[in-house]
Amino acid sequence: MFLSLFCVIIVAVGCSSKDGNVKLEFVQAMWRHGERSALADLYPIYEKDWVFGGGGLGELTGRGMGEMNNLGRLIRERYVRKFNFLEPKYASKEVYFRSTNLNRTIISAMSLLYGLFPPSLYDIPNVDYPFTPLKWLPGLAFVPVHVDGSDQCAASQNCPCPRYDFLQQQMLTLPEVQQAFQQVILLNRQIAPLYNVTTGVDTFYVYPDTWKCQRAYFNKTMYDKLPWYNEQLYSKAEITYAPIKGFLEGSFSQPAVTSNGLDVAFEIQQVRSGVMINEIVSRASEKLNCVERGQNCTSYLNKLKFYGYSIHDNNVYAVLVALGIPHISATEDGWPSYAAAIFFEFYRNSQTNKRLFKVLYRQDASSQITDVTSQVPMCQGVSMCPLSTFQHLADVLKPIPDINTVCNITS
């Protein structure tokens, strides 16, 4: 019998049940950065107009900082106040935060941490921060964010991967993809002339994402300068491009097998999410091994409780696709919203040593963190899922012998 009473009665950091003592041991989370400026110039808005959050293209806005701060507060509410799992102030051995090497993800992590560990009476002057009246905000203690190096590009999909380029060409032979791309090309041919674009019309892809950013701050300017622009056209662009975003991460509504037998959906998932899924499962397994060894564990994971990763919409979406729940992103344009987040909670039954996990999702900047474990197909409707099922998924998606070798296979 599974843990039907889970989280009805919370005892400290775990729950009691008929199956024994089930305790939360480890949490891994990943989130999309907060709202950003556009990535490209597009009339009538140019880089000089993007003054928010330091200014420039692709930068986190002040609103985006607030979105991430709110996510940090939600994390604090769950893991500090509700579960008594994390210390109320920063403890270096308990938490580890990582980011891709872009300003918007780095500052998103910093903003989140300001919500997770805000200035408080828990922070001690001259211990957690310098006591210099009028020169330092009382209680403000910094938390490090570790930025990915060039050797960590695979998990965040930033490594060059000729195999992925090959798979994108192969997917263009699929009827589902051809139909969706035809709609994109027709829309591009409608929009490009309005910007006086005469070459590369079929690949004029810049406008949907740019409109999304522009309308947040310059909606009146757009209506004044672009007499043909309206909300219906914006929505059409978002909806038309949404299937393409799904294909790029291995999400298809029909069997995605080419005429020569290549399973494009599986192959794309392997190179796009395989490394990330395996990192998550491997880290969780090592942590739970460490818990079972107790004092004999010398791993850095010995005291670590929370591992967070500040990344991008396509990274989060790729994991949702791998889990079989891409639909929960629930956005018009397909990919997860700003400040969307996935949480993996890993539990251990101290009597049976059974390992379990839960999946939680935060849909957007105005949403709460919601348990979606029962929606994950491999969990078959249960509220707590055996870790072995996650391990099986990792084994299936693992690039063999390694991602570098797989990425260099172009046939």
Swiss-Prot record:
Documented EC number(s): 3.1.3.2
SUPFAM superfamilies reported for this sequence: Phosphoglycerate mutase-like (SSF53254)
The entry's keywords: Disulfide bond, Hydrolase
Catalytic EC class: hydrolase
Annotated active site: 33 (nucleophile), 313 (proton donor)
Disulfide topology: 379-385
InterPro entries per UniProt: Acid_Pase_AS, His_Pase_clade-2, His_PPase_superfam, Histidine_acid_phosphatase
Matching Pfam families: His_Phos_2 (PF00328)
One function term, GO molecular function aspect: acid phosphatase activity
CDD domains: HP_HAP_like
Domain of life of the source: Eukaryota
The reaction(s) this protein catalyses: a phosphate monoester + H2O = an alcohol + phosphate
PANTHER family: ACID PHOSPHATASE 10-RELATED, ACID PHOSPHATASE-RELATED
Family: Belongs to the histidine acid phosphatase family.
Protein name in UniProt: Putative acid phosphatase 10
Protein source organism: Caenorhabditis elegans
